[in-house]
């Protein structure tokens, strides 16, 4: 039996991404402007319900991350994502009902959220395991300048395959 290749190409210059090469030399993680289904499905707001053994169920990675960061663990957040999540949390913060307890989520916890969310969808797990291209989450600002986003998530995704293998064995 041959050994599973868990490598992801690490040679891409992350400061000089050519969006026309999405799906060729990288996977763009974005909800709408991506050439690949994998890039769309890995977006932080993409709906993929998953269960974390310590923290419970969430509708998306963004819901899990936001819930974790807030002081008052509002159960409604588990089922919100995208603009609805941001509006709900903004309203809570402005009214004083809630506040951020932490600014950042630890790498190991974000990795756990990503692992459990990917494993919750067998087809997504298969796509991630077969991908050899680096992941990059980015957008272009109003001046059409390249901007990276979700850097922590991108970094973790580019090194997640061994963890997925460990949990599947």
Feature locations, PLM:
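Charged, low-complexity intrinsically disordered segments
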Residues: 2-169
């Amino acid at each position: 039996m041959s050994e599973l290749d868990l490598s992801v190409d690490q040679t891409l210059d992350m400061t000089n991404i050519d969006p026309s090469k999405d799906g060729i030399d990288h996977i763009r993680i974005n909800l709408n402007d991506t050439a690949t289904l994998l890039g769309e499905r890995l977006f932080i707001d993409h709906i993929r319900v998953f269960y974390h053994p310590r923290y419970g169920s969430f509708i998306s990675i963004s819901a899990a991350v936001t819930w974790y960061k807030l002081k008052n663990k509002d159960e409604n957040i588990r089922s919100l994502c995208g603009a609805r999540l941001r509006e709900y949390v903004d309203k809570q913060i402005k009214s004083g009902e809630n506040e951020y307890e932490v600014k950042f989520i630890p790498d190991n916890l974000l990795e756990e959220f990503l692992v459990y969310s990917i494993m919750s969808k067998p087809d997504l797990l298969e796509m991630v395991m077969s991908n050899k291209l680096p992941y990059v989450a980015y957008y272009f600002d109003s001046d059409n300048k390249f901007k990276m986003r979700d850097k922590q998530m991108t970094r973790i995704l580019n090194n997640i395959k061994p963890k997925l293998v460990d949990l599947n064995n």
